[in-house]
Amino acid sequence: MIRHIAIFLCSLLMCSTTFADSVTSVSLGALLTALNERMLLMKDVAAYKMKHHLPIEDFTREQNVFAEAEEEAKNNGLDPHSITPFIRSLMDASKAIQYRYLAQWRTGSEPSFPIQTLSVTRQRIRQLDNQMLIIISQRLMVGAFSHDDMVWLRAQFNAPNLNESDISNVLAALSLVRRAR
């Protein structure tokens, strides 16, 4: 009888380790996809703002994004205060990308692709932000992001006009995110 219990417990332990590994690999890939897609959308945002002569900086909008992210963080079991640096880093990287596109277009040809409305693009950005918070929360249930996770994310995080400093800031802020107690 004891032997059967020992075998059962060993099997359970192996299954939980396998499950945790699969959650980790799936969540890292999904997180990376959402991060890259979010940054790719900045080209659309920059094009719209250029066409309509809008500033890149929008303090009121940023405050709304923080409030929405903190609420979504709470809903997903994350410490809302720990998510603030991550959201800030995403916004800073996003604005940097927009400025870089504007500089390119002002010295060369303007965008020649169909420009999405800002409301449609912002809706998709919000969906991606919420998706990232869900993924991060699920990932943190099985443990913190490891050094290897961060190395992998850094190697794969590669949207146009995103530089190494932007990537470092986003990943450093990601490592600060915690689950709520």
Curated annotation (Swiss-Prot):
SUPFAM superfamilies: Chorismate mutase II. It catalyses: chorismate = prephenate. One of its GO terms (molecular function) is chorismate mutase activity. GO terms for cellular component: periplasmic space. The keyword Flavoprotein does not apply. Its EC number is 5.4.99.5. It is found in: Periplasm. Residues 1-20 form the signal peptide. Catalyzes the Claisen rearrangement of chorismate to prephenate. This is Monofunctional chorismate mutase. It comes from Salmonella typhimurium.
